[in-house]
Amino acid sequence: TAANSQVTESLDQQTATAEILRVISSSPTDLQPVFDAILDGVMRLFHPWSANVCQFDGELIHLVATHGGPSEAGRSIRDRFPTRPMAGLTIGRCILDRAVIEIHDVKTAAGLSAATREMAGVRGWRSALAVPMLRDGEPVGAISISRAEAGAFPAGQVELLQTFAAQAGIAVENAR
């Protein structure tokens, strides 16, 4: 039933959130297990085409975890990092604006760079969502997901990705 499905989904979300908190507490100085746990939770709960976690050092964005998309696309995205945050890149705009960026359709969205449209074509995505990881209001990274189909992301996914990003921000602060 729909009620059972909703309960299961809620339990899965709570489990993923608890797992990330467990990893944060067990690896206070090593961020990679945290980023990997976030990516695992995102892939399990959202079933996106691809997902990425990036760290921002104040100057450059570094890809620290990636999953999904065709294997050759994984290489192409790794080749683009580190990079400076630019408004024409989904993650770059997310970091610069310190805001959630949602692209409903890469083919029609305004303000995207040719590189972003090319990346979408290579990786096979049409819609994307990027959420900043903040520490004291300053960007320390971002989490992004993409889907092969165009369209808006459900509000619950946006909120849960924001929760994961907040947890990652705490982990970054703890590691410093």
Describe the function of each predicted region.
Residues 1-33, 140, 156-159, 176:
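Signal-transmission linkers at sensory-effector interfaces
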Residues 39-43, 52-86, 96:
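GAF sensory/regulatory domain recognition
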Residues 60-62, 71-79, 104-127, 147:
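Signal-transducing coupling segments at domain and membrane junctions
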Residues 69, 142-151:
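Short beta-strand-to-loop transition segments that serve as allosteric relay/switch motifs
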Residues 87-90, 126-134:
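A short, aliphatic-rich beta-strand micro-motif
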Residues 131-143:
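Short hydrophobic/glycine-rich mini-motifs in sensory/regulatory modules
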Residues 162-169:
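Allosteric cytosolic regulatory segments
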